[in-house]
Amino acid sequence: MSYSVTLTGPGPWGFRLQGGKDFNMPLTISRITPGSKAAQSQLSQGDLVVAIDGVNTDTMTHLEAQNKIKSASYNLSLTLQKSKRPIPISTTAPPIQSPLPVIPHQKDPALDTNGSLATPSPSPEARASPGALEFGDTFSSSFSQTSVCSPLMEASGPVLPLGSPVAKASSEGAQGSVSPKVLPGPSQPRQYNNPIGLYSAETLREMAQMYQMSLRGKASGAGLLGGSLPVKDLAVDSASPVYQAVIKTQSKPEDEADEWARRSSNLQSRSFRILAQMTGTEYMQDPDEEALRRSSTPIEHAPVCTSQATSPLLPASAQSPAAASPIAASPTLATAAATHAAAASAAGPAASPVENPRPQASAYSPAAAASPAPSAHTSYSEGPAAPAPKPRVVTTASIRPSVYQPVPASSYSPSPGANYSPTPYTPSPAPAYTPSPAPTYTPSPAPTYSPSPAPAYTPSPAPNYTPTPSAAYSGGPSESASRPPWVTDDSFSQKFAPGKSTTTVSKQTLPRGAPAYNPTGPQVTPLARGTFQRAERFPASSRTPLCGHCNNVIRGPFLVAMGRSWHPEEFNCAYCKTSLADVCFVEEQNNVYCERCYEQFFAPICAKCNTKIMGEVMHALRQTWHTTCFVCAACKKPFGNSLFHMEDGEPYCEKDYINLFSTKCHGCDFPVEAGDKFIEALGHTWHDTCFICAVCHVNLEGQPFYSKKDKPLCKKHAHAINV
């Protein structure tokens, strides 16, 4: 559906275009500035611009469309077409308001700023619905971070403080049941993201209780309990090697399993031990019983301080107790502690929130160096490798039937008056190519030359002409030459066996133009594309060049063009076959064309007058122009090869651009170019070296100055009379 819009000027109009003829896509509105004139005129993004001020945009390039819009006088009239693409519909799903789980360590009473315990308060939703029981231990609001108090407790008696013995006893008795816990009293601000109590025994116990409650809620089939999230069944690949190893380990005898559990209970995880057993390295770094006993001894640590800034845990927090004990200086214990740290870091993020590679790097000890574990990478041996078998050289020659087959000089001697044909080419194990001697040509009293279209070439009896590699001519391919050598030669398979090294030298002479008669003459300079040329006629003489079209000897008058010689009847236009002997021609794409065909198929189009360019072409702004069409917008003079500037879509010569658009210094009247230091004062622009006192010529940059008759003066000459 087309519609017209008229925007009231002046610009800016508030929309952006894309596309054009040079981009092979229609002009489209790609962006509309909110609140602009285009937005107020109900323009839509993606609409096609059909016409600008009544001019169709089908033949406009992107730059031409921009210039057309810029040249709009006061109002801009646009004819547009609605885009056929549907308006994109948002596919974003609405947010699901679901309760978020409480981080267990944030449920502990936090220290307030004055050192007292900060106690949470029950939510108003719990008071409003006394019949609803919610699991405060499992989930609560992420904004209030409070648990819900039981309505029975709220109605029967006062709420006990968190630190009282009765509250502790009641909370311990309610851990195994579904009843909610007793909550503290009035609400106070709490601290969040506090790492205190993250790894305490109470936190781990609460996490286990949450998991058991979610399992019971799933097994009951009555829906989710207390806003708990569903637990998905894990997809187990029973064909994986790790799963088979786990099943095999679970089916071991009880005594072996107990021994396995005893060894892996204190040091490494079960998965890491299974992998160690599969690779055969489970006994590489086993500690002795002394290390097991010492590792179970509790170690006193320094108190943990809290900070407002979140900082990563120190590497010491991931060390085992054995590594922190003073007796851990022995090589064996250092190896055990490093192994424990490596296992803890490999077990996953549940074992340690920060994986630090430094404990592994410091785990080197003489015991570990004496019996290193086998590396998973490929071992490198310093010994000499086994000698590789000596490669055999096999050169395969690609034999193709060709019209031009060189013949050794010894096997080719044409006699006058006899027909001859080239000898069939027979490959040999190592043929040597010997060029024939220089051609000798003896003209007869009446030489005749008649080219025949037949494949067999029969020379006239008079001339004794011997072909050379540079100007060799042979007849059409014979039947034996056109067939592959493995058909015509019975010994081909023995000659070119894979075990033999064969080198075949072959030369294929392609038809090309005859070289210049005088090799020491001046070289032909390359001409510009689209330059008109004329062929030069030469009379018949003792000179016998080769034709650039048929590659035959020219006997009689000939033409010279593009550095080659031609038969007059064969130098024709490549398209219309018009003779180019006496007319101008243009060389294009390795062919010659007359003026009419060149204008029709190859001549560029001027960007201003939209006509064919048959003479000198000007290339500018990614377009082609007549030299008389690409001129300065001010003085209307052609640029030639000189510099020009673009301003508002129009080209200007350097002189007019400086006079019209450049900023000039008020002191020296020269333009202030890019990179020059300048000063703006007294309503003008100055070079930093031109802003001086009009009397004493002292530089006034950064100094207080006075003005008189629009001239700067220093403080000393501020009251000068003659300025």
Curated annotation (Swiss-Prot):
Q: What is its main location?
A: cytoplasm
Which organism is this entry from? Mus musculus
What UniProt keywords apply to this chain's record, in alphabetical order? Cell projection, Cytoplasm, Cytoskeleton, LIM domain, Metal-binding, Methylation, Phosphoprotein, Repeat, Zinc
Q: How does it assemble?
A: Interacts via its LIM domains with various PKC isoforms. Interacts via its PDZ domain with the ACTN2 C-terminal region. Interacts with MYOZ1, MYOZ2 and MYOZ3.
A GO molecular function annotation here is:
protein kinase C binding
The record, for InterPro entries, names: PDLI1-4/Zasp-like_mid (IPR031847), PDZ (IPR001478), PDZ-LIM_domain (IPR050604), PDZ_sf (IPR036034), Zasp-like_motif (IPR006643), Znf_LIM (IPR001781)
* Descriptive protein name: LIM domain-binding protein 3
Localization recorded for this chain is:
Cytoplasm, Perinuclear region; Cell projection, Pseudopodium; Cytoplasm, Cytoskeleton; Cytoplasm, Myofibril, Sarcomere, Z line
Renumbered to this chain, the Polar residues biased-composition regions fall at 490-509
For the keyword Isomerase, the answer is no
Q: Which PANTHER family match?
A: LIM DOMAIN-BINDING PROTEIN 3, PDZ AND LIM DOMAIN PROTEIN ZASP
Identify the SMART domains for this entry.
Answer: LIM, PDZ, ZM
Outline the segment boundaries, as ranges, of region: Disordered: 89-134, 164-193, 280-423, 436-525
What GO biological process terms does the UniProt entry carry, in alphabetical order?
A: sarcomere organization
PROSITE patterns membership: LIM_DOMAIN_1, LIM_DOMAIN_2, PDZ
On this chain, the residues bearing Phosphothreonine are: T119
The record's CDD domains line, in alphabetical order, gives: LIM1_ZASP_Cypher, LIM2_Enigma_like, LIM3_ZASP_Cypher, PDZ_PDLIM-like
Would I find Transit peptide among this entry's keywords?
Answer: no
Instruction: Name a single GO cellular component.
Output: perinuclear region of cytoplasm
Please give the residue positions where the record annotates the modification Omega-N-methylarginine.
R216, R512, R529
Where is each PDZ domain found?
1-84
Give the function comment from the record.
May function as an adapter in striated muscle to couple protein kinase C-mediated signaling via its LIM domains to the cytoskeleton.
